[in-house]
């Protein structure tokens, strides 16, 4: 019985290794991307969100032979962030990384106009997006995202939002 179990385990492991792939890159290889990061109102030496994000973008670029660049908005408002995102796109960057909830309005204004560009938004929640999207339709937002369907207001199919469960770290730290 032990020999049969060991044989099945070896067979399962060998199939797992075979399934790991041939080492070929898929059709949308990382080399076809140019990644830009737009800072919020800080810069890439803030020892916080912007710096951490920029370091990750640079590491990804080096590991995957992808061109990277960062842009700092000239003003601390949605218009400044929109201008920086549009400049990055005009310069050929097709993946835009944006760290922070301040990009909610920027995403709603820019992403639908550039369906071939991918947007990665860090710490941008549904409510951050809804606030601008609902206002753009002339409606009043009640700050309860569960009452709204974002897709009824704006197409953000080219946007990925990563939300951190900050409450878990707070709990573990005793807060």
Where are these regions (language model features)?
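Short, low-complexity disordered leader/linker segments with a strong preference
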Residues: 1-33
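A residue-level marker of the well-folded mature domains of exported/periplasmic proteins
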Residues: 24-175
């Amino acid at each position: 019985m032990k020999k049969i179990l060991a044989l099945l385990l070896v067979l399962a492991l060998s199939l797992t290794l075979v399934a790991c792939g041939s080492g070929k890159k898929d059709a949308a290889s990382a080399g076809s991307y140019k990644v830009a990061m737009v800072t919020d109102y800080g810069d890439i030496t803030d020892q916080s969100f912007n710096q951490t994000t920029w370091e990750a973008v640079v590491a990804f670029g080096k590991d995957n032979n992808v061109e990277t660049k960062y842009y700092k908005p000239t003003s601390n408002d949605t218009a400044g962030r929109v201008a920086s995102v549009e400049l990055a796109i005009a310069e050929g960057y097709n993946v835009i990384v944006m760290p922070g909830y301040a990009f909610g309005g920027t995403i709603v204004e820019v992403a639908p106009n550039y369906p071939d560009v991918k947007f990665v938004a860090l710490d941008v929640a549904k409510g951050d997006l809804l606030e601008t999207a609902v206002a753009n339709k002339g409606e009043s937002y009640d700050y309860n995202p569960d009452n709204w369907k974002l897709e009824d207001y704006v197409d953000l199919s080219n946007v990925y939002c990563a939300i951190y469960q900050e409450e878990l770290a707070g709990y573990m730290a005793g807060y």
